């Protein structure tokens, strides 16, 4: 029986593919090969003695056997055919093997593992029935995770993986958890500086207040809105500067840099303003020192988002996060391979891994008696994403409330956050998503000085 020489290329199980070529075969594979081909039996069959000949003596048999083995060696067994897996059950991309109970590609395997290990809670911005395939799999994390469960991926398999790793000696694990390597220490220091130099802390600001609509809520105070929109534009530019200073961020494609910035900008804006919350006065302070109470924040444009933001700020207080932790959490929010429409999600994931490790070690060294603080802080990303989704909707309604046009950088960065389609095309017919104005390479000192919102 001969074996077909035509095989399908299978990605290496341990490899990380950043580009997935179009499959050169139909989506449905032939049946999985059930077993290996039998080795050749040539030379192993016994030959009956020739009729009429006497039975040879044992010595003669041994001599003949030895001579035969020397003259006619048995050919080697043929190599088994390469194993061919069915396509990924989740997205139909090329599978790298069976992961967590089903045939899956590296991308869906990693997505499922991260989602379970981090207890991620996703939101679908459509009807919870998104099509998940090789092209659309990064567009809706909620529906992708549901598809993983539907095809049979097992939570327990992920947990068992983690339990295997925990079987290492306790002393070695403890040492690894608390030891900051030189590389991670350098990474942590760079991110701390990037955060502090793009976001002054509350104690560095000269706080000032305004009496404008301070005691009653209105739909929109235009004076406060003008001031808030000016400050928000400057904050967005500072977030872009922060991103450019993160190690590895500028090595990503320009398209991926823009995708990540637009997806995480509102997350980081909310996280930053909430670290400047003063519970005694129930106020928040902006980067120029302007301090607004809850009512004024509502009237400045936050509207129905106000109470969500203040609740989140109160939840941050017991965590007592310092600048290093806030900077690392901001970087993790930004550099996230689960964002929609990334060209190189695996590369983004690789950049995020040392950030997670650095935050874990830093938190455990700073709070050795609070081992659960790392997952508590990390889970704040889920809360931020939930608030940001509502924030993007708020930007859309604000367009109808303000008398003039929305400041371009706010509209471009916040309205088109992940899960929201751009509403208005540019003059050349392209959507704002592809506008070069928010390219990280274009937001430097010269472009800031030329921006009409900062002059």
From Swiss-Prot:
<keyword id="KW-0539">Nucleus</keyword>
<dbReference type="GO" id="GO:0000122">
    <property type="term" value="P:negative regulation of transcription by RNA polymerase II"/>
</dbReference>
<dbReference type="InterPro" id="IPR003078">
    <property type="entry name" value="Retinoic_acid_rcpt"/>
</dbReference>
<feature type="region of interest" description="Hinge">
    <location>
        <begin position="154"/>
        <end position="182"/>
    </location>
</feature>
<dbReference type="InterPro" id="IPR035500">
    <property type="entry name" value="NHR-like_dom_sf"/>
</dbReference>
<keyword id="KW-0805">Transcription regulation</keyword>
<dbReference type="GO" id="GO:0070660">
    <property type="term" value="P:inner ear receptor cell differentiation involved in inner ear sensory epithelium regeneration"/>
</dbReference>
<comment type="subunit">
    <text>Heterodimer; with a RXR molecule. Binds DNA preferentially as a RAR/RXR heterodimer.</text>
</comment>
<dbReference type="GO" id="GO:0048471">
    <property type="term" value="C:perinuclear region of cytoplasm"/>
</dbReference>
<dbReference type="InterPro" id="IPR001723">
    <property type="entry name" value="Nuclear_hrmn_rcpt"/>
</dbReference>
<dbReference type="Pfam" id="PF00105">
    <property type="entry name" value="zf-C4"/>
</dbReference>
<feature type="region of interest" description="Modulating">
    <location>
        <begin position="1"/>
        <end position="87"/>
    </location>
</feature>
<feature type="region of interest" description="Disordered">
    <location>
        <begin position="416"/>
        <end position="455"/>
    </location>
</feature>
<dbReference type="InterPro" id="IPR047158">
    <property type="entry name" value="NR_LBD_RAR"/>
</dbReference>
<feature type="region of interest" description="Disordered">
    <location>
        <begin position="44"/>
        <end position="78"/>
    </location>
</feature>
<keyword id="KW-0862">Zinc</keyword>
<keyword id="KW-0675">Receptor</keyword>
<dbReference type="GO" id="GO:0030154">
    <property type="term" value="P:cell differentiation"/>
</dbReference>
<keyword id="KW-0804">Transcription</keyword>
<keyword id="KW-0479">Metal-binding</keyword>
<keyword id="KW-0863">Zinc-finger</keyword>
<keyword id="KW-0238">DNA-binding</keyword>
<feature type="compositionally biased region" description="Polar residues">
    <location>
        <begin position="424"/>
        <end position="434"/>
    </location>
</feature>
<feature type="compositionally biased region" description="Low complexity">
    <location>
        <begin position="435"/>
        <end position="455"/>
    </location>
</feature>
<dbReference type="GO" id="GO:0000978">
    <property type="term" value="F:RNA polymerase II cis-regulatory region sequence-specific DNA binding"/>
</dbReference>
<dbReference type="GO" id="GO:0035108">
    <property type="term" value="P:limb morphogenesis"/>
</dbReference>
<dbReference type="InterPro" id="IPR000536">
    <property type="entry name" value="Nucl_hrmn_rcpt_lig-bd"/>
</dbReference>
<dbReference type="GO" id="GO:0071729">
    <property type="term" value="P:beak morphogenesis"/>
</dbReference>
<feature type="zinc finger region" description="NR C4-type">
    <location>
        <begin position="88"/>
        <end position="108"/>
    </location>
</feature>
<comment type="function">
    <text>Receptor for retinoic acid. Retinoic acid receptors bind as heterodimers to their target response elements in response to their ligands, all-trans or 9-cis retinoic acid, and regulate gene expression in various biological processes. The RAR/RXR heterodimers bind to the retinoic acid response elements (RARE) composed of tandem 5'-AGGTCA-3' sites known as DR1-DR5. Required for limb and craniofacial development.</text>
</comment>
<comment type="similarity">
    <text>Belongs to the nuclear hormone receptor family. NR1 subfamily.</text>
</comment>
<dbReference type="GO" id="GO:0032526">
    <property type="term" value="P:response to retinoic acid"/>
</dbReference>
<dbReference type="Pfam" id="PF00104">
    <property type="entry name" value="Hormone_recep"/>
</dbReference>
<dbReference type="InterPro" id="IPR013088">
    <property type="entry name" value="Znf_NHR/GATA"/>
</dbReference>
<feature type="compositionally biased region" description="Polar residues">
    <location>
        <begin position="47"/>
        <end position="66"/>
    </location>
</feature>
<protein>
    <recommendedName>
        <fullName>Retinoic acid receptor beta</fullName>
    </recommendedName>
</protein>
<dbReference type="GO" id="GO:0004879">
    <property type="term" value="F:nuclear receptor activity"/>
</dbReference>
<feature type="DNA-binding region" description="Nuclear receptor">
    <location>
        <begin position="88"/>
        <end position="153"/>
    </location>
</feature>
<dbReference type="GO" id="GO:0005634">
    <property type="term" value="C:nucleus"/>
</dbReference>
<dbReference type="GO" id="GO:0048384">
    <property type="term" value="P:retinoic acid receptor signaling pathway"/>
</dbReference>
<feature type="zinc finger region" description="NR C4-type">
    <location>
        <begin position="124"/>
        <end position="148"/>
    </location>
</feature>
<dbReference type="InterPro" id="IPR047159">
    <property type="entry name" value="NR_DBD_RAR"/>
</dbReference>
């Amino acid at each position: 029986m001969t074996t077909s020489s035509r095989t399908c290329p299978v990605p290496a199980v341990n490899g990380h593919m950043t580009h997935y070529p179009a499959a050169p075969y139909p989506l449905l594979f032939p049946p999985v090969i059930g077993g290996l081909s039998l080795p050749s039996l040539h030379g192993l069959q016994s030959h009956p003695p020739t009729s009429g000949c006497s039975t040879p003596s044992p010595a003669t048999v041994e001599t003949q056997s030895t001579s035969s083995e020397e003259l006619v060696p048995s050919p080697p067994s043929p190599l088994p055919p390469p194993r061919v897996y069915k396509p990924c059950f989740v997205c139909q991309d090329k599978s790298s093997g069976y992961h967590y109970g089903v045939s899956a590609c590296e991308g869906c395997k990693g997505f499922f593992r991260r989602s379970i290990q981090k207890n991620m809670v996703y939101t679908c911005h459509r009807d919870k029935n998104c099509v998940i395939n090789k092209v659309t799999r990064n567009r809706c994390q909620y529906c992708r995770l549901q598809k993983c469960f539907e095809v049979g991926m097992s939570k327990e398999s992920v947990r068992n993986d983690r339990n295997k790793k925990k079987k290492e000696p306790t002393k070695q694990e403890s040492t690894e958890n608390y030891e900051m390597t030189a590389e991670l220490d350098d990474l942590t220091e760079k991110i701390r500086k990037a955060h502090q130099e793009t976001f002054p802390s509350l104690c560095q600001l000269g706080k000032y207040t305004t009496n404008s609509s301070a005691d009653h809520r209105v739909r929109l105070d235009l004076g406060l809105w003008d001031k808030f929109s000016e400050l928000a534009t400057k904050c967005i530019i500072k977030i872009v500067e922060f991103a450019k200073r993160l190690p590895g961020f500028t090595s990503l494609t320009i398209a991926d840099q823009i995708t990540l910035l637009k997806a995480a900008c509102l997350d980081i804006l909310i996280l930053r303003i909430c670290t400047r919350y003063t519970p005694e006065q129930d106020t928040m302070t902006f980067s120029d020192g302007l301090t607004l109470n809850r009512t004024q924040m509502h009237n400045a444009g936050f509207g129905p988002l106000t109470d969500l933001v203040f609740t989140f700020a109160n939840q941050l207080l017991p965590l007592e996060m310092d600048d290093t932790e806030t900077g690392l959490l901001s970087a993790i929010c930004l550099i996230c391979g689960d964002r929609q429409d990334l060209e190189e999600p695996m590369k983004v994931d690789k950049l995020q891994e040392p950030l997670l490790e650095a935050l874990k070690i830093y938190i455990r060294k700073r709070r050795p008696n609070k081992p659960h603080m790392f997952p508590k802080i990390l889970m704040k990303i889920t809360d931020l994403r939930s608030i940001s989704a509502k924030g993007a909707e708020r930007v859309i309604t604000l367009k109808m409330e303000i008398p003039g046009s929305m400041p371009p950088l706010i509209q471009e960065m916040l309205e088109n956050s992940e899960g929201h389609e751009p509403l208005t095309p540019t003059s050349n017919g392209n959507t704002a998503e592809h506008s070069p104005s928010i390219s990280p390479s274009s937001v430097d000192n010269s472009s800031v000085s030329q921006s009409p919102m900062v002059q």
